[in-house]
């Protein structure tokens, strides 16, 4: 309920970002990474060691993936044909929010027409005709179009021209604070450089100078008239 005699149905909002990746030129590969605790043993005598796993997504059917917050699962898009300053492949990683996927049942019109929302990540070979995650006409097709159909071709996606698709959204349980005008809800993802730069890319960004911030050994400048952070006018 959001008000007297007024209810709001629980529902889902979904978006899909079509990311035609081109990291340092053509020929990109996607790898999936997770954090895994190492079992007790001679190489983990104190039980505090954990490892990162990596596996290549080589074909489209293998690349329809679901996020896992327990293992911090993320995906790296890299150019295996080049090396960075430390000998690795330059790339970016896709960090997603493991939010609920499509909750409608198998066979429902919503699920069959919005099949893209059954996975958090898809990777397909680039095809200029494959523009939309739900197909060209989602309101009228019988179901199965879009990403489920694209991925069913099972094309190779290793070291080639690829598209990374990310489905994300918000599962909304209505509350009184949403009425009569709903406040902002946030949904999104991050693309972060991983081995793409040789150092922190923010080092050459000019810093703002605050005239009131001075070294303690220096005489501070006279405060201007009016209130400041440290003086009352």
Predicted regions and their residues:
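Extended effector regions of multi-domain proteins
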Residues: 1-233
């Amino acid at each position: 309920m959001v008000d007297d005699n007024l209810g709001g149905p629980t529902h889902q909002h979904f978006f899909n970002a079509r990311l035609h990746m081109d990291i340092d030129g053509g020929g990109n590969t996607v790898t999936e990474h997770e954090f895994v605790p190492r079992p007790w043993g001679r190489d983990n005598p104190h039980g505090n060691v954990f490892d990162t796993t990596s596996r290549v997504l080589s074909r489209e059917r293998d690349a329809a993936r679901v996020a896992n917050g327990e293992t911090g699962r993320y995906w790296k898009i890299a150019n295996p044909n080049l090396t960075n300053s430390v000998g690795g492949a330059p790339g970016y990683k896709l960090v997603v929010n493991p939010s609920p996927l499509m909750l409608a049942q198998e066979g429902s019109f919503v699920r069959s027409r919005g099949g893209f929302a059954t996975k958090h990540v898809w990777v397909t070979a680039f095809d200029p005709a494959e523009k939309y995650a739900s197909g060209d006409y989602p309101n009228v097709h019988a179901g199965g179009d879009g990403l489920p159909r694209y991925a069913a071709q099972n094309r190779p996606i290793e070291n080639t021209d690829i598209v990374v698709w990310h489905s994300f959204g918000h599962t909304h349980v209505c509350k009184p604070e949403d009425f009569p005008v709903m406040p902002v809800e946030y949904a999104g993802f991050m693309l972060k450089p991983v081995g793409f730069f040789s150092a922190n890319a923010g080092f050459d960004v000019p810093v703002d100078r605050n005239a009131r911030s001075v070294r303690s050994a220096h005489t501070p400048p006279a405060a201007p008239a009016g209130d400041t952070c440290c003086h009352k006018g």
